[in-house]
């Protein structure tokens, strides 16, 4: 019996050449709507779906393949006598190949002017039903949903006259991944439209971007996936201009650096190591900002990741060229800067559209046996809600330093303390199990620069001991959430030493 293929695609990439190859193998082709029209326009002889179903395409194409003659031909088990007998009695013929991809729902809802009606109209019904039927019966049916697989199938047909069982199984698995991702997009879209923030089930879908050499350590396997609607201002959508392939750790660090530099509207440069900032500087131009970020910690920046929120010019590139760095991220690089930096063959250069998110996206964190979902911490300092419980208020310069430290401290692993002075960080204490321990690290790093600096703490002071350490170091202004039952003790210490202290009412833990 002559083999048959059913071809109905939204993405018509390569379909004419593929169908031509099927016809050359003596395979009869059934097609629908726009696909049939395209194939016939290219001189290929195909059978209309209505000739198989005996029923016209109706309701603007909503009903065309939902018919027993189609699904009987797909689902019949060819070595089951009962199935074969029923097919013969009902005049059905088997379908051996299904070439289908689905209505472009993702592309439709990505349009800024999409209406709800447009989105609904682009939910495919017949397509998923066909490919699921074919995939279930993959022992007898080859189902192709991705143009990438056209050449593989044709090559096996030409060489062996059939598609290998292992290939059919792989294609079937791809179908169910495809429909699961498709349904996830639809369910998430409808859930968002209804304003449901915590549905009873959560299905997420990501698209493979690249295999990585290894994970956090060489013995760990890793892959990088991107969200289907990831912000263009993200590592997932970065353009790599130069250098080695990004590693797992590179991607994590680049993401951390990008998150911090987005906090600033003025020219700013961030240096990151192990997802913590080691130096942050702002200035009148990007060269000045980089100089301050470097001077913040000229030791830790070695082998680090740099993110800038302005174009890298030649002068800045020459300074960057002086030390070993893993990555430099910027909105753009001047041609002269590229020529300087590309002389380092392994240095990764990334361009990213750097803009702060206008709304909080969801952050997913896996734990053993589950998944935590929360909003990203995008909250900025609101000066209308702060309070100043101390006798002295911050000076204009202290306010400037406090704001810089506060922008940075929310991105430092808790317990977090950041010291800032004169448009740059001068000390970062990260990840200690007690707050005073982080303060001591930041103060030690700052050294004599701590005198007259500002301190930011990501959470309140449970004891006044951190304030005592700050006072001994000559720190003159502090910003913290407040809210401890011992706030009065801290306020008394601050007043004793003439320290200005600001309560924000907002905590910025980061684990």
From Swiss-Prot:
Pathway: Purine metabolism; IMP biosynthesis via de novo pathway; 5-formamido-1-(5-phospho-D-ribosyl)imidazole-4-carboxamide from 5-amino-1-(5-phospho-D-ribosyl)imidazole-4-carboxamide (10-formyl THF route): step 1/1; Purine metabolism; IMP biosynthesis via de novo pathway; IMP from 5-formamido-1-(5-phospho-D-ribosyl)imidazole-4-carboxamide: step 1/1
Free-text note regarding domains: The IMP cyclohydrolase activity resides in the N-terminal region.
Protein family (similarity comment): Belongs to the PurH family.
Taxonomic placement: Bacteria, Bacillati, Bacillota, Bacilli, Bacillales
Gene Ontology MF term list: IMP cyclohydrolase activity; phosphoribosylaminoimidazolecarboxamide formyltransferase activity
Enzyme Commission numbers on file: 2.1.2.3, 3.5.4.10
This protein's name: Bifunctional purine biosynthesis protein PurH
Any GO BP annotation: 'de novo' IMP biosynthetic process
InterPro entries xrefs: AICAR_Tfase_dup_dom_sf, Cytidine_deaminase-like, MGS-like_dom, MGS-like_dom_sf, PurH-like
The keyword Ion transport is assigned to this record: no
Gene (UniProt): purH
């Amino acid at each position: 019996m002559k083999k048959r293929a059913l071809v109905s695609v939204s993405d018509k990439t390569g379909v004419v050449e593929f169908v031509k190859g099927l016809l050359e193998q003596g395979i009869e082709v059934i097609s629908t709507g726009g696909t049939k029209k395209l194939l016939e326009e290219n001189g290929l002889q195909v059978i209309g779906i209505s000739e198989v179903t005996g029923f016209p395409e109706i309701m603007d194409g909503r009903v065309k393949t939902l018919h027993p003659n189609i699904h009987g031909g797909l689902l019949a088990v060819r070595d089951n006598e009962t199935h074969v007998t029923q097919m013969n009695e009902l005049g059905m013929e088997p379908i051996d190949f299904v070439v289908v991809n689905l209505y472009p729902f993702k592309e439709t809802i990505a349009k800024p002017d999409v209406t709800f009606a447009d989105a609904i109209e682009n939910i495919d019904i017949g397509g998923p039903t066909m490919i699921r039927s074919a995939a279930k019966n993959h022992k007898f049916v080859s189902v192709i949903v991705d143009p990438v697989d056209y050449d593989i199938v044709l090559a096996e047909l030409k060489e062996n006259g059939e598609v290998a069982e292992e290939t059919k199984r792989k294609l079937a698995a791809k179908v169910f991944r495809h429909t699961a991702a498709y349904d996830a997009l639809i369910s998430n879209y409808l859930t968002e439209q209804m304003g449901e923030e915590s549905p009873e089930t959560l299905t997420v879908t990501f698209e493979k971007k690249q295999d990585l050499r290894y994970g956090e350590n060489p013995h760990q396997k890793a892959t990088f996936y991107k969200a289907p609607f990831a912000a263009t201002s993200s590592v997932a959508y970065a353009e790599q201009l130069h250098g080695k392939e990004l590693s797992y750790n590179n991607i994590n660090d680049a993401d951390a650096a990008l998150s911090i530099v987005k906090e600033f509207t003025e020219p700013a440069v961030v240096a990151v190591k192990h997802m913590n900032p080691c130096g942050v500087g702002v200035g009148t131009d990007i060269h000045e900002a980089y100089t301050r970020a470097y001077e913040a910690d000229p030791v830790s920046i070695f082998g680090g990741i740099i993110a800038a929120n302005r174009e890298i010019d030649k002068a800045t590139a020459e300074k960057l060229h002086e030390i070993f760095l893993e990555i430099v991220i910027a909105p753009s690089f001047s041609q002269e800067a590229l020529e300087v930096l590309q002389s380092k063959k392994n240095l990764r250069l990334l361009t990213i559209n750097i803009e702060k998110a206008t709304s909080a996206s969801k952050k997913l964190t896996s734990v053993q046996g589950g998944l935590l979902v929360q909003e990203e911490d995008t909250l900025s300092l609101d000066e209308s809600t702060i309070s100043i419980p101390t006798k002295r208020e911050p000076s204009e310069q202290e306010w400037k330093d406090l704001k810089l430290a506060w922008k940075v401290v929310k991105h430092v692993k808790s317990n977090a303390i950041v010291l800032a002075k004169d448009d740059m960080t001068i000390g970062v204490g990260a990840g200690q199990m007690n707050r005073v321990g982080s303060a001591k690290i930041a103060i030690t790093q700052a050294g004599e620069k701590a005198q007259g600096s500002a301190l930011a703490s990501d959470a309140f002071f449970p004891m006044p001991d951190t304030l005592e350490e700050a006072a001994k170091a000559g720190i003159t202004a502090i910003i913290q959430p407040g809210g401890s039952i011992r706030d009065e003790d801290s306020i008394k210490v601050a007043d004793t030493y003439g320290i200005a202290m600001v309560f924000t009412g907002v905590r910025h833990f980061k684990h």
